[in-house]
Amino acid sequence: MHGTDSSSDTPGQPAPSRAELLSAHAEGSISEDTILKTARDRAVDIGVGAVTPAVGALLSMLAKLSGGKAVAEVGTGAGVSGLWLLSGMSDDGVLTTIDIEPEHLRVAKQAFTEAGIGPSRTRLISGRAQEVLTRLADDSYDLVFVDADPIDQPDYVVEGVRLLRSGGVIVVHRAALGGRAGDPAARDAEVTAVREAARLIAEDERLTPALVPLGDGVLAAVRD
């Protein structure tokens, strides 16, 4: 029939927004190898989240741009983000990854081994990130990736920035909580913490930040 709206294939369902279409295109443009797909399946099996393929590709690019000799990760999960980070790091780069769950570290180690990554290139640490980070050296890391409980994001940002060398990059995943952080009516503890982390980054004159609308939001900032 002439004049009908064909923007939605499902009657009664709203057409995807431009933002949704862009996100779907970004995710669909990235392919993952068998090792990454297996690690992603294991993440589902153990009930832990994993970065999307597009976020992973962004991590790989940022790791390469930063030099990728020394990278710290808060929240190992099943090793999906670690695999992406390592793919962009230098051949002799070392990934230090922290998780409070030994099972997560075990599964991630399996993924790294399957990818042919030697044990000298990863340092897996079990413990509370707030405590472990304080033991890492100042001004020594090219990139710090935060992908853990949003409630603790402000603490991780403070410690993460301390670890960065000049030109290093801090990357915070779940920085928009899928858009909730931008909703003025949302004031729960997670949203409050994420906003505080963003404020800390925005007000730090040493940092140049950008919020990237991939996954649940990625906030990245480079240190002067």
Curated annotation (Swiss-Prot):
Single annotated GO MF: S-adenosylmethionine-dependent methyltransferase activity
The species this protein was found in: Mycobacterium marinum (strain ATCC BAA-535 / M)
Pfam families in UniProt: Methyltransf_3
Polar residues bias spans: 1-11
Record has Transferase as a keyword: yes
Gene3D superfamilies found in the cross-reference section: Vaccinia Virus protein VP39 (3.40.50.150)
GO biological process, one term: methylation
Name of the top EC class for this enzyme: transferase
Keywords, sorted A to Z: Methyltransferase, S-adenosyl-L-methionine, Transferase
Residue positions binding substrate: 147
Chain spans, region Disordered: 1-20
Positions that bind S-adenosyl-L-methionine: 51, 73, 75-76, 81, 99-100, 149
Lineage: Bacteria, Bacillati, Actinomycetota, Actinomycetes, Mycobacteriales
Family: Belongs to the class I-like SAM-binding methyltransferase superfamily. Cation-dependent O-methyltransferase family.
Protein name: Putative O-methyltransferase MMAR_4217
EC number: 2.1.1.-
